Amino acid sequence: MAPIPVTLITGFLGAGKTTLVNELLRTPGPRRLGVLVNELGDVGIDGELMGEEADGVVELTSGCLCCSVRGELSDSLTSMARIEPPPDGIVVETTGLADPGPVIDTVAWLPDLLRLDALVTVADARTCLRLLDDPELGEARRQVELASTIVVSKSDL
């Protein structure tokens, strides 16, 4: 079996990551997607918004993907990749506070099962420059630096 492509969706809080994931899930086509959602809050709103479009939504709520839940992320990705039949792709939506580097590393540690297909960073047009200039928000800069694609959201507001 060829490694399953993983699309990592990052972006700072409120940028529109879940909206983008929902659009990916609604895109017609004969494909099965697995979705992993990282939520830091007590209520996993993002997972609830996914609705029934996803073939499998796994919510990681015990911490940020970039640090405390790396083992849980690896376990969840491995389990999802081994579902029969396996998904055609896996979408991982990080919390807005995540440095994507460790998540990329986790995918790289599973080369027989997974390959990083894209790192998409969603940037809110109204707040992006301010966030990138804030020295305390290195995660925002890192999300943009590592992105293979940047989607500018809310440009019409």
What are the language-model segments listed below?
Residues 132-136, 144, 154-157:
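GTPase G-domain guanine-specificity segment
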Residues 100, 141-144, 148-152:
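Hydrophobic, well-ordered secondary-structure segments
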Residues 94, 122-126, 147-157:
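G-domain G4 guanine-recognition motif of GTPases
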Residues 2-10, 15, 19-140:
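Nucleotide-state-sensitive switch-loop elements of NTP-binding domains
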